């Protein structure tokens, strides 16, 4: 059947900010969907609050709303745009929950909007645990024994029947939020209490424990003619009990017998039919008891999910693209496969390789968090690798993580029993502990007993260990041994450490013996048909599939797995660079290993190499490209710190680096040399010094005065940074933080209190500067720029300051020798402009600045990298001629970027949320943007989009450090004028009352029960009578009362503000929300407004 012709306009809901459990994979899915809709002639309206996405590029959809994804806001967009249909299956749980709310509120019916891709009934059947149980039964499957509960009393009764341990799963949450394993009553109160709160329907499923069973997923698609295909089977290496997003997974499933696979397949097909998914995809999770083979259906997602992105990249089968076509009414046999161009989508993909995905965690950012892996997802990113066998794919995936100690090691003196005891608890180290225990002499039976990891995988670890012994014991590294090692995924560095030689020496020997990888193709059909999209992976096989190409290629190194400090923003710059270079006629090559991202889509670049971003793997890709037609050069400054770290080594190997040279990159990172650049430019940095020991650091701190900011050299995301107020704190820091970069000295800077921090993104071509944007931070200096809210254009900086910023940026760019993008952080204190740091690369603010000013900076940077000038780009229309981002006219729209933080995901071993206090080390996973005519409404939108809409009435708890009390008086007066009740502890309340401000006193936590019936702030928070918390930490109480209050508020979803600067902005936003209703405006309309403001009132007339 051909597509429907009645759908002229479709609203797509994105997934919003990157959070744990819902990440870049939805930008990848959404971007594909929008492209399909446009190709089919449909008008596309998009709502997504995340500016760091490709899908929110104004060129993609017809109307792009970077607005909060709340039912009320989406209803306004529907009222304004009047779409025919809503496609909610590509924006994760956020989009599904919003669609359900719009349906319940009657909005869809009122405006005649049809839901496509999934119907409400199918969503309810798939997501509602009680209804889904019935579905499984009717489909001939079995569910774990369970009870649905809505209160703690019901939960306690259910446990009488199920017995401990029980699994707790809330309805309608994603990434396992609020779920966990309860071993006793205390656990049940803690986990089930949180689960009832996180579930929008206050509904929780308690089920019998299936801990230690094997876990599988099937990725399915079905069309309206009842054609069903299984796109991919995925097996978790970790047994049930670890969230699938935190587990190492492998595709295709390795340990299923054919009969077991057919059983799972039959159940899946029956379930997808029973649920009624008839125009799209879903994934179904199973548990299989290794003892008796009993199969239990765990759950399904009636939408495109994290697993769909993995399955798409693993198979080359574009699930999101095909799901969108199905939603438009096509059937599978009518949709051609892009890769083969001969087979339809109804052909199930066939794999002649193995894919392994390994999660990446960020526990180092939350030292207080419990690192045990449970059913609540905690990983912040993932790496994927492809090999001809499991061992090769696993070892490639592990080295793709780029974390110290992520590659398998082979210590000869380990205690197998101690390692197995450690491995019996699921943590990030379980895989290496198990492999090393086997290396040290543990048996497969003992390892299975301790970990419940299937013996087939344990046998593969033994095989890797045997090859390691062969490498260690061989008299010489001959060709046969090197080939065997490489076929099992050993890197030159691993071989070197086993042979006590340098990786470069191993590489030399390997090349001399002619042991080089070949590149194979992901083609969906195991080479049965020709593949037209070059999507490659390396293997030490016999023949290569890289075809000769005309013209030299430009290679872009991606940013690897997402992590805190290096996320989707860098992928955005890589994708934009590819687009700009392809438009200019260059052949582009992308090298990356992150399955979630747009950059690893097979049609973004001319060729995609799905490879680890290590020196060894990148040099081999360059060699393959050289051999097949030549390389113009490599871009290293777009993907964050990952490719930047390789710049000098690549240059040393004779690889041409495009854009800013490695010498210039080093100059900006090197303390002493950069100080000379500033000196020559007549600019100042805060007083600073370097230290290699505590005595050194103490001497520098005494010279420049406390507080000081201490950090290691060469880090991204403020890793290991701290503000230190005393000698004791300095001693503690030196004792704990010297491991980060052992060969680099520690940096000690004077910390500027109460300074305004300014962030600048600019382009420089060697003669001319284009100032991309000047952002003013809302919090004072001292909070990492990635965690701080910022506004563009600045709201309190005068033209003279902007002129000084422009001059300083130009002098630094020229002094460093930048060709392309540079990001500089300034601090303005007592009217002195200090230079904090300069990064000659794409920064995490590039997407935000590009969206706010309507100028694609990363595209322009790529063109400068291949030799074009800013003047050329102005002439070509890529950069504006009349203005730049530092001289935006009055009347330009105001954009606010706000960080989104993952504190609810991380709990201490006692089960409390980790502290939400911000500092110089970055902790946010994502960002949102609020954009409007004025700052106050733009800021209000950013807070709503970040998940904590500000209250417009109610009770506000305030408790501030002494240094903030003067500021608080004015702010509290405004609160009272707005009709809020102010609640405070003794000291702060006394100050407020002396200034004529009524304040209700509550007891400090330590004084619980001592005051006359006032109750503590914690009791009031739990009773739901506090709507907003302002708590700024003082040196002493930061870890006691303050922490308890912030942790309780965070876990209860009450907005917590930790600086008076941000609280001031919140007050403006609350006033704006009270006085008028905000409107929704598309990016395209904002851009038109900006052009109108530039042209001036005459043009408008």
Swiss-Prot record:
Binding site for Mg(2+) 3: 825, 837
Alphabetical keyword list: Amino-acid biosynthesis, Arginine biosynthesis, ATP-binding, Ligase, Magnesium, Manganese, Metal-binding, Nucleotide-binding, Pyrimidine biosynthesis, Repeat
Superkingdom field: Bacteria
Renumbered residue ranges of the record's region Allosteric domain: 948-1101
One GO-annotated biological process of the protein: 'de novo' UMP biosynthetic process
Region (Carbamoyl phosphate synthetic domain): 545-947
Residues binding Mn(2+) 1: 285, 299
Residues that hold Mg(2+) 2 according to the record: 299, 301
Residue positions binding Mn(2+) 4: 837, 839
Function: Large subunit of the glutamine-dependent carbamoyl phosphate synthetase (CPSase). CPSase catalyzes the formation of carbamoyl phosphate from the ammonia moiety of glutamine, carbonate, and phosphate donated by ATP, constituting the first step of 2 biosynthetic pathways, one leading to arginine and/or urea and the other to pyrimidine nucleotides.
Name of the protein described by the UniProt record: Carbamoyl phosphate synthase large chain
The encoding gene: carB
């Amino acid at each position: 059947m051909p597509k429907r012709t009645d759908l002229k306009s479709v609203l797509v809901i994105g997934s919003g900010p990157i959070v744990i459990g819902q990440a870049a994979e939805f930008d990848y899915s959404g971007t594909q969907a929008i492209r399909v809709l446009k190709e089919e002639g449909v008008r596309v309206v998009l709502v997504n609050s995340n500016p760091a996405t490709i899908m929110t590029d104004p060129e993609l959809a017809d109307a792009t709303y970077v607005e909060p994804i709340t039912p009320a806001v989406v209803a306004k967009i529907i009222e304004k745009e009047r779409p025919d249909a809503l496609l909610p299956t590509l924006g994760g749980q956020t989009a599904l929950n919003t669609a359900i709310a719009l349906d319940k509120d009657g909005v869809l019916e009122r405006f005649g909007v049809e839901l496509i891709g999934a119907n409400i009934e199918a969503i309810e059947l798939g997501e509602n645990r009680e209804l889904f149980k019935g579905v499984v039964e009717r489909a001939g499957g079995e569910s774990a024994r369970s009870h649905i509960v809505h209160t703690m009393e019901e939960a306690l009764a259910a446990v009488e029947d199920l017995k401990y341990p029980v699994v707790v799963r809330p309805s309608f949450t994603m990434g396992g939020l609020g779920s966990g394993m309860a071993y006793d009553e205390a656990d049940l109160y803690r986990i089930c209490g949180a689960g009832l709160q996180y579930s929008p329907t206050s509904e929780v499923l308690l089920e019998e424990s299936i801990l230690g069973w094997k876990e599988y997923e099937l990725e399915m698609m079905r069309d309206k003619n009842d054609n069903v295909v299984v796109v991919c089977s995925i097996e978790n290496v970790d047994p049930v009990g670890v969230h699938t997003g935190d587990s190492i997974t492998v595709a295709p499933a390795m340990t299923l017998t054919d009969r077991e696979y057919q059983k799972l397949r039959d159940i899946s097909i029956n379930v997808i039919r029973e649920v009624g998914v008839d125009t799209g995809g879903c994934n179904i999770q199973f548990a299989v008891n290794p003892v008796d083979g009993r199969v239990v259906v765990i759950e399904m997602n009636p939408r495109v999910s994290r697993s769909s992105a993995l399955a798409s990249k693993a198979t080359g089968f574009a699930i999101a693209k095909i799901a969108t076509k199905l939603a438009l009414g096509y059937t599978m046999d009518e949709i051609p496969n892009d890769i083969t161009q001969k087979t339809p989508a109804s052909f199930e993909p066939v794999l002649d390789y193995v894919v392994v995905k390994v999660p990446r965690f960020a526990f180092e950012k939350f030292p207080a968090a419990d690192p045990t892996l449970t059913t609540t997802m905690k990983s912040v990113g993932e790496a994927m690798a492809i090999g001809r066998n499991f061992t090769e794919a696993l070892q490639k995936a592990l080295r793709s993580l780029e974390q110290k100690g992520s590659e398998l090691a082979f210590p000869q003196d380990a205690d197998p029993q101690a390692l197995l005891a450690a491995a019996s608890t699921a943590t990030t180290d379980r895989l290496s502990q198990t492999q090393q225990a086997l290396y040290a002499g543990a048996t497969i039976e003992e390892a299975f007993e301790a970990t419940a990891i299937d013996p087939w995988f344990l046998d593969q670890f033994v095989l890797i260990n045997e090859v390691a012994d062969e490498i260690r014991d061989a008299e010489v590294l001959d060709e046969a041994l090197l080939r065997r090692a490489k076929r099992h995924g050993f890197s030159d560095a691993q071989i070197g450490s086993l042979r006590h030689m340098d990786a470069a020496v191993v590489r030399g020997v390997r090349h001399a013996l002619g042991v080089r990888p070949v590149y194979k193709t992901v083609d969906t059909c195991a080479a049965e048909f020709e593949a037209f999209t070059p999507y490659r992976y390396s293997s030490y096989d016999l023949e290569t599939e890289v075809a000769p190409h005309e013209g030299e290629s430009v290679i872009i190194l991606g940013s690897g797995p997402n992590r805190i400090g290096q996320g989707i923003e860098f992928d955005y710059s890589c994708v934009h660079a590819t687009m700009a270079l392809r438009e200019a006629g260059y052949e582009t090559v992308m090298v990356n290993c992150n399955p979630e991202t747009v950059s690893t889509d097979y049609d973004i670049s001319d060729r995609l190499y799905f490879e680890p971003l290590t020196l060894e793997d990148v040099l081999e890709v360059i060699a393959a490209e050289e051999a097949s037609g030549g390389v113009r050069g490599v871009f290293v400054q777009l993907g964050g710190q990952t490719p930047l770290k390789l710049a000098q080594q690549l240059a040393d190997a004779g690889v041409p680096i495009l854009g800013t040279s490695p010498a210039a990159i080093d100059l900006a990172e090197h303390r002493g040399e950069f100080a000379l650049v500033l000196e020559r430019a007549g600019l100042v940095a805060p007083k600073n010094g370097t230290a290699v020991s505590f005595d050194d650091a103490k001497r520098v701190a005494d010279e420049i005065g406390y507080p000081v900011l201490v950090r290691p050299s060469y880090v991204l995301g403020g890793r290991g940074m701290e503000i230190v107020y005393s000698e004791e704190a300095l001693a503690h820091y030196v004792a704990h933080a010297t491991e980060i970069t052992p060969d680099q000295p520690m940096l000690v800077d004077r910390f500027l209190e109460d300074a305004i921090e300014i962030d600048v993104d600019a382009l420089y071509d060697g003669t001319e500067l284009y100032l991309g944007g000047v952002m003013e931070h809302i919090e004072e200096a001292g909070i990492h720029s990635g965690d701080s809210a910022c506004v563009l254009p600045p709201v309190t900086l005068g033209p003279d300051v902007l002129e000084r910023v422009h001059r300083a940026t130009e002098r630094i760019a020229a002094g460093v020798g930048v060709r392309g993008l540079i990001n500089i952080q300034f601090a303005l204190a007592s009217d002195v402009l200090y230079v904090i740091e300069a990064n000659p690369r794409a920064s995490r603010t590039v997407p935000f600045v590009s969206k706010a000013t309507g100028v694609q900076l990363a595209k322009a940077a790529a063109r400068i990298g291949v030799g074009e000038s800013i003047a050329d780009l102005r002439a070509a229309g890529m950069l504006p001629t009349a203005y730049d981002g530092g001289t935006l006219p009055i009347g330009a729209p105001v954009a606010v970027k706000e960080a989104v933080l993952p504190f609810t995901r991380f709990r201490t071993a006692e089960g409390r949320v980790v502290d939400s206090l911000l500092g110089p080390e970055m902790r946010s996973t994502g960002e949102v943007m609020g954009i409007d005519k004025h700052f106050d409404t733009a800021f209000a939108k950013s807070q709503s989009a970040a998940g904590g809409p500000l209250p417009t009435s109610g009770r506000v708890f305030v408790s501030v450090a002494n240094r903030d009390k003067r500021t608080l008086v004015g702010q509290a007066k405004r609160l009272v004028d707005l009709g809020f009740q102010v609640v405070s502890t003794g000291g702060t309340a006394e100050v407020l009352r002396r200034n004529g401000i009524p304040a209700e006193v509550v007891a400090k936590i330590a004084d619980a029960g001592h005051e006359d019936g006032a109750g503590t702030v914690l009791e009031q928070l739990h009773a739901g009578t506090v709507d907003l918390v302002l708590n700024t930490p003082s040196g002493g109480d930061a870890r006691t009362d303050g922490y308890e209050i912030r942790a309780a508020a965070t876990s209860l979803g009450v907005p917590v503000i930790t600086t008076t600067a941000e609280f001031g902005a919140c007050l403006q936003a609350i006033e704006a929300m009270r006085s008028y209703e905000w409107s929704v405006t598309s990016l395209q309309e904002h851009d038109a407004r900006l052009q109108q403001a530039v042209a001036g009132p005459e043009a408008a007339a």
